[in-house]
Amino acid sequence: MGREINQRKAAIIGCGFVGSATAFTLMQSQLFSELVLVDVDFDKADGEAKDIAHGIPFAGQMKIHAGTYEDLSDAAIIIVTAGAGQKPGETRLDLVHKNVAIYESIIPRIAEQNKDAILLIVSNPVDILTYTALKLSGYPENRVLGSGTVLDTARLKYALGEHLSVDS
């Protein structure tokens, strides 16, 4: 802590499907000059970083690399995608106990390194995990954001459109 925040640096915690897709999207967006990928499996994060880096010549300039929690100290935004995958027949609420346990191990480590970043929570169930991250991090409320329920809204609109035979 005590380092100046780099407003053009982002970090992603969790390099599964969502984390990797988020990293690729951020690389294409050119919003950041540096992106750090952190995962419990460093080699996985390193492989994802290298794969995405190969697309940089077509998108602009960005430094993308695997890192550790220490690399979060100057990140402006930390996106948390880590969590257990949802199994067939399992509801998002079934994920609560698994993902809260995961958050209990990672959120304090994030907060140790950086108290000034914005935390963007993406893992499901996002509302409960956003609250969990808020409590575990000690961050002020305006610095812990959840990705919301846009996907749920899209699914509902689609289902209603199908049921009513109208465009969604």
Predicted regions and their residues:
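Rossmann-fold NAD(P)-binding glycine/threonine-rich loop
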Residues: 88-140
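A short, basic/flexible loop-to-alpha-helix module at the beginning of a structural domain
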Residues: 1-8, 32
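Conserved S-adenosyl-L-methionine
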Residues: 28-34, 138-141
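Glycine-rich Rossmann-fold phosphate-binding loop(s) that bind the pyrophosphate
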Residues: 15-16
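Gly/Ala-rich phosphate-binding loop of Rossmann-like dinucleotide-binding domains
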Residues: 23, 27
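Rossmann-fold dinucleotide-binding core
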Residues: 82, 121-168
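N-terminal Rossmann-fold NAD(P) dinucleotide-binding loop
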Residues: 19-20
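Conserved N-terminal Rossmann-fold NAD(P) cofactor-binding segment
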Residues: 34, 38-76, 90
